[in-house]
Amino acid sequence: MYDKFKPEQAVGLMDFVRAAKSCIKEISPDELKAKLNAKEDFLLVDVRESSEFEHGRISGAHLVPRGIIEAAADTSYPKHYPPLSGARNQQIVVYCATSGRSAMAAAVLQMMGYKNVLNLAGGYTRWEIEGNPVVREAEY
């Protein structure tokens, strides 16, 4: 993804999001809901910040903020996150608030060798607006 930009070019956030979206696959809220209802085996990763996660999330999601995704996914890093770092060959669905951060996270995971990463189109915002179930309290 980064090879599309030359050092002399000034780039902004949306340039990175567009570049990421050009090389990843997305899943619609309806498709994700069907996967959840069918109890398919995949890892659901919320890349928002913890304060966003605490206000509401999709049931079963693992919180791995975008700012630490590379460290969490790298088994050679001492503080990696085993559910993510061990899912290299498993399907992973990532989401954020509107799908920008998660698009970049999906692209990075692919660059790190993850084989089957999907980004939730429209993110948590679209998921919630479309009336899909959310969790607003702790899950144990």
Residues of each region from the PLM?
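Rhodanese-like catalytic fold shared by cysteine-dependent sulfurtransferases
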Residues: 1-42, 50-91, 100-140
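Short, surface-exposed ligand- or partner-binding patches at beta-edge/loop junctions that are enriched
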Residues: 95
